[in-house]
Amino acid sequence: MVDKISGIVISVRDYSENDSLIKIISPTIGINTYLARGSKKTKSSLKIATQLFTYGDFFGKYPKKNGLGYLNSSESTSIFKNISLDIILNAYASHIAELLAAAFDENTNIDQWYFMFFQALKKIDAGLDPQVIANVFEIQLLSVFGVEPNLFSDPINGQTEGEFDFSEQYNGILSKKNYHLDDRRLHANPKAIYYLRMFSKIKISQFNSINISENVKRSLQRVINLIYDRQIGLKTRSRTFIEQMNSLQIKYPNDSSN
């Protein structure tokens, strides 16, 4: 019996001269790896269908426990074209996919996260800021990793509105009145903390446009990276690539050919 796997291709690796290993995220069985037989052959129906960030229906066999599934054919597939053509958009989309793969075991029903991921890819492909979309995922996935910083109120006085900074010592936000209690608070941009809090509960589908300054985005990313580095111990390969690209842009901001 042939199984139907509906989902999004999030990883493609060479396996043999004619075959590839394809990782697909699906709402019902989560993230799994499949052997795409003959996908590297010129006339294979899977050649185009198994490109990165292609989505649709694939046919083959579900993976057995601790094993590979396989794919023989596909149907009604499409691709997020702009993501596939732009190295930066691709990197942010891959970063989100790597976070999801780290957060969930294989064969896990993750329908909520799957549809959130699909919405994220649509937004990135349509031109919304990929860093902002990735930040929403980074923040909302924290609880899945077992990390839940307090982003809703100052733990000392219960303050929920006003200016805040992030404190490792208090594992969350600290109001301006209590800055003196933590000399090692992050000194983050107050607007970055505002977005940190907002992104913890916003839905991707609510984003139609958003404009955040580069300084605020850098400050927000610094807070998020600190949490992932020190409390989770996770740094994706795509995040490393993004940081390398960002450092080049800072080093050569006006480099152009005439």
From Swiss-Prot:
GO terms for cellular component: bacterial nucleoid. It comes from the Bacteria. The keyword DNA damage applies. The keyword Membrane does not apply. Belongs to the RecO family. Keywords: DNA damage, DNA recombination, DNA repair. The lineage of its organism: Bacteria, Bacillati, Bacillota, Bacilli, Lactobacillales. It holds the Pfam family RecO_N. NCBIfam families: reco (TIGR00613). Involved in DNA repair and RecF pathway recombination. This is DNA repair protein RecO. The gene is recO. HAMAP family: RecO.
